[in-house]
Every structure is written in C-alpha cells, then in structure tokens.
C-alpha cells in the first residue's frame, strides 16, 4: 500500500484516516514565524460524509485508501436498494439510500455514473455532471410576466425540484448541473 507524505497531499487525494477512507477537500501548507511548519487539510470521510479539519507536522505520512472509482450503469430501484451494473463485466452492486444520498434525485434508469468502491463495497455514488431530464410539473408562463426574472420551480421526472426560466413549459427536456442543482439550458431529444 502506498504512503503519502505531507508534501504530496493535494485536493482529491484519497487517504486512510482513523481506519476510514477519506478524500482531501482542501490542503494548506502553513509556515508560522516561530515553530515547525505544518499542513492543514480538510477531509471528507467517504463512509459517513462528515467533513473534518486535521493538521499534520511536516514529514508525517498517511496510507493511501484502497478505493476505486468505477463507471457503472444504474439499472433500477426495488424500494430498498438501488441496483448498478458494470457494463463490461455485468457485475452488479446493490446500494442503500444512505450511500446514494443526494445522487438519487438525478438518476434515471440506464444512466451511467461513478461508484466509489472500498473493499469491494460501494461507499459513494457520483452522478454525471450534467443530466437531461423532463419536466413533469411547473406553472404556466404567462405572456409579459417577466418582472423580477427570477424563474419558477419545476418538478422533474426523478422528483427533483429546480428553478427554471419562465418560458420553460411542462413536458420539455432540460439540462441540469447536478453539482449545483441548477438549470443550464433546454435540451433536444
């Protein structure tokens, strides 16, 4: 297993902290006027989702987390588990809702997303950055109703609710940024 020194820490690096796989979100090298230099990192526990801040003296090391990001296709939800499949090997994984978290509102059947596996167990699901979904319910846009220009809420086919411009109607396909949960543009079929 690889070991990373504090000078090798960078954003996105996956390491083991307190016997749990973590991803480094932010890394800062601090050299105070007096005393030894240290590295302050902000990490997200991949199993629980908690974000904590830790400091390490220069020269400290952390073991790498044996995690793998695998592209998988979302198959279906049986009420209790969400089922995913590796397209090349047809290997299937069942994921609980607490692992899926917010990704559930952006997934529809046959979508390809990234599952993070640790000890061959799914611990995180990352939806694609952009998805195209149909609007199932929104208020009708009235002609000339442009004051404020803020938009209106729209319910998508997966149950997610996003703010859309006034000209968008029920039944249209839209492109949504899953990282921010925002409307990007109209989409063609």
From Swiss-Prot:
Query: Which PROSITE patterns does the entry mention?
Result: EFP
Which InterPro entries does the record match to this protein? Elong-fact-P_C, NA-bd_OB-fold, Rib_uL2_dom2, Transl_elong_fac_P/YeiP, Transl_elong_KOW-like, Transl_elong_P/YeiP_cen, Transl_elong_P/YeiP_CS, Transl_elongation_fac_P
Its PTM note reads: May be beta-lysylated on the epsilon-amino group of Lys-34 by the combined action of EpmA and EpmB, and then hydroxylated on the C5 position of the same residue by EpmC (if this protein is present). Lysylation is critical for the stimulatory effect of EF-P on peptide-bond formation. The lysylation moiety may extend toward the peptidyltransferase center and stabilize the terminal 3-CCA end of the tRNA. Hydroxylation of the C5 position on Lys-34 may allow additional potential stabilizing hydrogen-bond interactions with the P-tRNA.
Q: Which residues cross the membrane?
A: none
Report the protein name in the record. Elongation factor P
Q: Which GO terms describe its molecular function?
A: translation elongation factor activity
Cellular component GO terms, alphabetical: cytoplasm
Which cysteine residues pair off into disulfide bonds? none
Record keywords:
Cytoplasm, Elongation factor, Hydroxylation, Protein biosynthesis
Q: Give the domain of life.
A: Bacteria
Query: Which GO biological process categories is it annotated with?
Result: peptide biosynthetic process
> Where are the N6-(3,6-diaminohexanoyl)-5-hydroxylysine residues found in this chain?
34
């Amino acid at each position: 297993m690889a070991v990373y020194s504090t000078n090798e820490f960078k954003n996105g690096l996956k390491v083991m902290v307190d016997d749990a796989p973590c991803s480094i979100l932010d890394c800062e090298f601090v050299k105070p006027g007096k005393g030894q230099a240290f590295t302050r990192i902000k990490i997200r526990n991949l199993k629980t989702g908690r974000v904590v801040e830790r400091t390490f003296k220069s020269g400290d090391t952390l073991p790498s987390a044996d995690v793998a990001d695998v592209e998988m296709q979302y198959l279906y939800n049986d009420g209790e588990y969400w089922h995913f499949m590796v397209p090349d090997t047809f290997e299937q994984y069942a994921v609980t809702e607490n692992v899926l978290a917010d990704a559930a509102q952006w997934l529809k059947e046959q979508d390809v997303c990234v599952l993070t596996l640790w000890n061959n167990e799914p611990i995180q699901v990352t939806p694609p950055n952009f998805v195209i979904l149909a609007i199932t319910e929104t208020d009708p846009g009235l002609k000339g109703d442009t004051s404020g220009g803020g938009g209106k809420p729209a319910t998508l086919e997966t149950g997610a609710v996003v703010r859309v411009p006034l000209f968008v109607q029920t039944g249209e396909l839209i492109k949504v940024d899953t990282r921010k949960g925002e409307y990007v543009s109209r989409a063609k079929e």
